[in-house]
């Protein structure tokens, strides 16, 4: 297994990206408004910022990955810009934001091209940005090249109104349960998955509990008919 020939801390373009995008401003620990909480974070206000597109050179081995992927896509009649929305280098990590209709082609090229060989997909994570209109749901795939000792991420977005993303099961079969979990918790529908059913919540569960718009629930207590209210409804002391 080869080692990268440059330390990412020395790479050009590794410090950040341009055109950062503010997708939300959260107040308090749970992002609720108009009510108190007992967490001690009731006065916390922070912007949720997503890094923007990075300019070339990306640094480290990232330029080589982009170039080899572009060549592979071109052989299949696909332009790099038609498949990749943006390339982000942030905190020494490479993320390719992929258009969802091109996800399977990009993943297969990354897996099969000898100079890329990202043989391992470590699963898929869901993210929900309710204020990012038209791109509220994100699926993030960490990839690892065992051959070349390299890492990158693929990120795909979909709107709440059309939460469909192609399944990567055909390219990375080990994503089977990971896609089921992301569907279970975020409601992303992975088209082409052989058995997209809930994997942790009961089959008749209503909603997807890791979405930001999912209501915070209280805890039923078995004695005296009491119920602990959800965090955003508790009395505040600040």
Curated annotation (Swiss-Prot):
Residues 1-20 are annotated as: Disordered. One of its GO terms (cellular component) is plasma membrane. It is a peripheral membrane protein. Pfam families: Complex1_30kDa. Its main location: membrane. Keywords: Cell membrane, Membrane, NAD, Quinone, Translocase, Transport. It is found in: Cell membrane. Coiled coil: none annotated. One of its GO terms (molecular function) is NADH dehydrogenase (ubiquinone) activity. Its EC number is 7.1.1.-. It catalyses: a quinone + NADH + 5 H(+)(in) = a quinol + NAD(+) + 4 H(+)(out). InterPro entries: NADH_DH_suC (IPR010218), NADH_quin_OxRdtase_su_C/D-like (IPR037232), NADH_UbQ_OxRdtase_30kDa_su (IPR001268). NCBIfam families: NuoC_fam, PRK07785.1. PANTHER family: NADH DEHYDROGENASE [UBIQUINONE] IRON-SULFUR PROTEIN 3, MITOCHONDRIAL (PTHR10884:SF14), NADH DEHYDROGENASE UBIQUINONE IRON-SULFUR PROTEIN 3 (PTHR10884). NDH-1 is composed of 14 different subunits. Subunits NuoB, C, D, E, F, and G constitute the peripheral sector of the complex. NDH-1 shuttles electrons from NADH, via FMN and iron-sulfur (Fe-S) centers, to quinones in the respiratory chain. The immediate electron acceptor for the enzyme in this species is believed to be a menaquinone. Couples the redox reaction to proton translocation (for every two electrons transferred, four hydrogen ions are translocated across the cytoplasmic membrane), and thus conserves the redox energy in a proton gradient. Belongs to the complex I 30 kDa subunit family. This is NADH-quinone oxidoreductase subunit C. It comes from Mycobacterium marinum (strain ATCC BAA-535 / M). The lineage of its organism: Bacteria, Bacillati, Actinomycetota, Actinomycetes, Mycobacteriales.
